[in-house]
Amino acid sequence: MEPEFDHFQSQMDSDNTHQSTMFNVQDNNAILMSGMENVLQSPRQLQAAAQAQQQAAAQAQQQQVQAQQVQAQQAQQQQQQQQNQQQQQQQQNQQNQQQQQNQQQQSQQMTQQQLQQLMPPPPTSDTSNFNDNISYFVYGSQFTVPRRYSIVKCIGHGAYGVVCSAKDNLTGEKVAIKKISKAFDNLKDTKRTLREIHLLRHFKHENLISIKDILKPNSKEQFEDVYIVSELMDTDLHQIITSPQPLSDDHCQYFVYQMLRGLKHIHSANVLHRDLKPSNLLINEDCLLKICDLGLARVEDATHQGFMTEYVATRWYRAPEVILSWNKYTKAIDIWSVGCIFAELLGRKPLFQGKDYIHQITLIIETIGSPSEEDICNIANEQARQFIRNMGNQPKVNFANMFPKANPDAIDLLERMLYFDPSKRLTVEEALAHPYFQSLHDPSDEPICLHKFSLNFEAWDLNRDLLKELIYNEMLAYHPEDPQAPYYTDLNNPNFNLSRIQSSSELFNLLQQQKQQIHQQVNQQSIKN
């Protein structure tokens, strides 16, 4: 019976297990059903969440749009402010410009009114008041001229003085008037003034500036400022070279030809200019060229000491023999200067822009090549000779490559002007006869000076009073109506022998003797009449 019991019990246990399993399944189903209920509820929640997200996104987008609108409004306001500021600035600038224009117009009107008040137009027939003086103030300096001249404007000022353009009411010509203030305070400058006046008064040439008048002071005692009246030119060669104005080969040819034509007249009088440079070559709008500023000029055969050592020529246009202190230099120094100016016309910049003496001679040798040993031996300074030897053998630069657009004849002429050895350079007559000037050269229209100059006073230690006397003497030549005009003595007259003069006092006495003799001759002639 036991087994059965056991079997039954086993069956019971099995049933119980099955029942227990059934209960477990039911529990799981209940859990599952509970989870399903949760799952069935999530779409509503998700929909609500989605709506919330959409609302949040819409709000964020709206806020972003509003922020962008605010930024756009701010940017527009800033732009408007900038435009307003620009308009205000433009208006302010316009107002400032208008004020400046008004001030300039007022200034011009005031100047014109002052000129009209100071100098009314002179009558066309009555010139009785032409000798009455009238004063202007130009750059702080009193500018006193006769009413014969109507001042137009200031055209230059510097250490040398003031230059004004003016109209000569007697002739109708336009002139330039240069005032040399305190002309007798510096003896070196006074001597330069005397030299230039004396030379220009005698030179009469189309390509040399001419002195038309030296204004007469009220008295010799009041003679402190020198006023020189000359031709009025439009510009100078330096201004033309540095301008954008195109320069053709015809321009270069005509300018250099006129330089040489004027220089021929100077050299024929045995005078060296010694300071040729573009700013000393005056030009008119019709391309007429005139050489000016002979203040550094010298007579070639001068025997006085110091002739070779005195400062001469602007460095860029200075010949090698001047820089290196050769024992003697000649008219060839002016040909060198013309060559430098010619190259500047071709290249529109200076050929040798040396910063000092050493740099200048270095540039020259690097361009035209090393000099020969014979040329080096002509240099007086041993250190200069050694410096050039230490440079070694420098080859010559090809000017045709330097100036590729230049006329071949122009290149040939330039090379012949810029030899290191002055004796190998062309003379002014040879340069004028060069093929480059074939269409211009006419020996019959290239006049020379008919008499030689001999400026013996260069050797004397002239004092202030004697220099003043000599310049006053030169002034009298322009005023034959002056009672003292008969006392005028031409220092270059062969009859006025200066060779025996040894001192300034002897010269002064000789001048007085000459004047007394002239005065006696005038009186005798008056008695006969």
UniProtKB/Swiss-Prot annotation:
Pfam families: Pkinase. Keywords: ATP-binding, Cell cycle, Cell division, Kinase, Mitosis, Nucleotide-binding, Phosphoprotein, Serine/threonine-protein kinase, Transferase. Residues 100-117 have a biased composition (Low complexity). A motif (TXY) lies at residues 309-311. Dually phosphorylated on Thr-309 and Tyr-311, which activates the enzyme. SUPFAM superfamilies: Protein kinase-like (PK-like) (SSF56112). This is Extracellular signal-regulated kinase 1. It comes from Dictyostelium discoideum (Social amoeba). The lineage of its organism: Eukaryota, Amoebozoa, Evosea, Eumycetozoa, Dictyostelia. The gene is erkA.
